[in-house]
Amino acid sequence: MKKEPKIVMIYLNNAATTLFKPPEVIKAATISALSVGRSAGFDATAERLSALREKLLKLTNARDHFVVLTPGCTFALNQAILGLAARLPPCRILVTQAAHNAVLRPVYALAKRRFPCAINAADEFGRVTPTARSTARTSNQKTGNNPTPKPPYEAADNGFSYGVVPTDEFGRVTPETLAPHLTPDVKIVVISHMSNVTGGIDDIAAITKLLRSRGIYSIVDCAQSVGIMNVDLSNIDIAAFPFHKSLHALSGIGAMIVREGIEMEPLVYGGTGTLSADKDMPDFPPERYEAGTHNLPAINAALAALDWLEKYEEEIRGNLDYIGKRLYNGLYDLYPKVKILSCDNPGAIVTFVTTDTDFDSAVFAQSLYDHGFVVRGGLHCAPLMHERLGTSLSGAVRVSPGIDTTETQIDSFLLTVKRLISP
């Protein structure tokens, strides 16, 4: 029986996770995995952790901040949103239509009282103290004020609420479009630096300047931007990003950049290697937010990735820009059968639909897979963005080349799309 020739897959889903990992990264992770594990308390490990934090602060120009290492970007965003809210009196949180579910779902959970925040236990400056929490608990016990638990998804009564700020068609907001939504009860605004659907980029410097002038905390989701462009986080309060995307390191590690002086409740409690006799977590960062054993192979891989990125940064970004424009222009030439949803400066994200009335992004993505191309169909974990685009039912096809994507591969992809949309 004659065997079918094996299709060599071309990976174009780098916005989800980058396929290419530099040899230095693989080597660092392998050596670390094969070595005797050492906790953060050992000098050599402490030096590696300190070096990684310092490199991240330099990369993001965040000198007045500290770095919290997390199991990933989703964890970091949960820690930022829920941990910060737990230190505030009941308030309103704003997200944008570009928000990823890693932002939306923690906010929804908070508003539906599915996260234990310290309600009505703040001082006059909005700070929650152990004494205030204890007083609130004692008062509730004396008065019998123990509210009956409400079933999931019922309207909240804890005072927290959220609002969605409309974006333009590329998922962008500006200080001018954001300002009317900044009512006195808004205390946290979560911004998506780069849309994972359209590649649209927000001016976070201008936005966070506005928020700071109003005394509002800023949380910035930098999952798509760090590594692919210069990112200046000097004005933000909290930012989160992973290492497995454009930093070309491993999954299982993320980072949270936090302005000095900002306090949050920890999301996870456990051993830190410091103050082990205390019943509570240490009250100083980053240990307060880093319970448990660090992912040392991923940390060593991240260090190697940052060294590699610093060496080849200009070459990497130049290639991505060229390949991204070639992809965008090629799909643009297929109009009107193909409609591009990305902005005309898409970086490495180009998302499209076809004008076929029966278009289904999952089916189209599968057809591309059958022809040897890995792309991403569906809603991309950004349902509000697809509502804005009118693609909630069909979804869209996202194509995200990487630094190792060639002109030949892009041209082959474009030819395949053309054949699939032809009658």
What are these language model-derived features?
Residues 1-142, 146-423:
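Pyridoxal 5′-phosphate
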